[in-house]
């Protein structure tokens, strides 16, 4: 049996440290911890790393489709690795929660996240797991739009807390991974 962990984010160096790419950042942390190396898989519309966690085969996947088209890559990987819906986890940013908030659950809505919406639409089901990582919402006067906000870099204060936040997210999914 294989588990598929999909980080939602945008490809390209300009997006690496943006709020929308927190899913990719969490997968990078997991890959580093379990000695996985990402490689390109054009026919899966993604780069992926295979790791073993608690004797469980786990595929870490970062779609190359941009956030709003994530479902195409998830479906391709689901078919290629023959993964059941219960063994899919999608990691995404959540602007409806403050920075540092972590939520892990199954069978839930998109919360307005276009990558989650697209994944649910393409899979024709929301019966997969989600790890939502709060990145906050702009609240100061003259705040940039939501799209600009999620495509902007973390604040200095957030960067100082980012490793602990990612660790908190990883710990939240360890039971699902069998740890």
Curated annotation (Swiss-Prot):
The active site is at 20 (proton acceptor). One of its GO terms (molecular function) is tRNA binding. One of its GO terms (biological process) is protein quality control for misfolded or incompletely synthesized proteins. PROSITE patterns: PEPT_TRNA_HYDROL_1, PEPT_TRNA_HYDROL_2. TRNA binds at residues 15, 66, 68, 114. It catalyses: an N-acyl-L-alpha-aminoacyl-tRNA + H2O = an N-acyl-L-amino acid + a tRNA + H(+). GO terms for cellular component: cytoplasm. Keywords: Cytoplasm, Hydrolase, RNA-binding, tRNA-binding. It is found in: Cytoplasm. SUPFAM superfamilies: Peptidyl-tRNA hydrolase-like. The keyword Nucleus does not apply. Its EC number is 3.1.1.29. The record marks 93 as: Stabilizes the basic form of H active site to accept a proton. Pfam families: Pept_tRNA_hydro. The record marks 10 as: Discriminates between blocked and unblocked aminoacyl-tRNA. Belongs to the PTH family. Hydrolyzes ribosome-free peptidyl-tRNAs (with 1 or more amino acids incorporated), which drop off the ribosome during protein synthesis, or as a result of ribosome stalling. HAMAP family: Pept_tRNA_hydro_bact. PANTHER family: PEPTIDYL-TRNA HYDROLASE. Monomer. This is Peptidyl-tRNA hydrolase. It comes from Chlamydia trachomatis serovar L2b (strain UCH-1/proctitis).
């Amino acid at each position: 049996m294989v588990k598929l962990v999909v980080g939602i984010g945008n490809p390209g160096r300009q997006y690496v440290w943006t709020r929308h790419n927190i899913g990719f950042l969490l997968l990078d942390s997991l890959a580093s911890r379990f000695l996985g190396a990402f490689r390109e898989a054009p026919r899966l519309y993604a780069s992926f790393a295979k790791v073993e966690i608690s004797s469980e085969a786990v595929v870490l996947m970062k779609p190359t489709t941009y956030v709003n088209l994530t479902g195409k890559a998830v479906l391709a990987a689901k078919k290629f690795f023959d993964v059941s819906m219960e063994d899919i986890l999608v990691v995404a940013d959540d602007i409806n929660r403050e920075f540092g908030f972590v939520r892990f659950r199954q069978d839930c809505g998109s919360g307005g996240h276009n990558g989650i919406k697209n994944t649910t639409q393409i899979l024709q089901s929301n019966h997969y797991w989600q790890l939502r990582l709060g990145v906050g919402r702009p609240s100061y006067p003259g705040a940039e739009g939501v799209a600009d906000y999620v495509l902007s870099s973390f604040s200095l204060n957030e960067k100082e807390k980012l490793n602990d936040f990612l660790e908190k997210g990883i710990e939240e999914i360890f039971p699902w991974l069998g740890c």
